[in-house]
Amino acid sequence: MAAEVHPTAVVHPGTVLGDGVRVLEHAVVGKQPTLSPRSTAKREPLAPAVVGAGTVISTGAIVFAGSTLGARVIVGDQACVRERVSVADDVVIGRGALVENDTTIGARTRIQADAYVTAYSTLEE
């Protein structure tokens, strides 16, 4: 089953969408981050985002380049998944949650609405 992308959603070039992925209204997938001139973060372009089969990127959500979402993940409305984040299968990221860069989230983890997950975190099953 092909991925379904709403006409108002933005899927950046190179992004990999698995079978049955749904990208809903005004969502953005595969965006390269824009760094401040004073930022000490790495400046090289990131690999494309990868979204596993059956995953839903909800309305207004953002998934940055360099991140990988497993199968059957739900990214809630207006949630944000920053660069170099690895999300395993069957994870729920609640509405308005922010997952900062370089984070690993284990299978079947539930991140509640409006949660803030700091950079370089590991959340296990």
Where are these regions (language model features)?
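Left-handed beta-helix
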Residues: 6-7, 12-13, 18-19, 24-25, ...
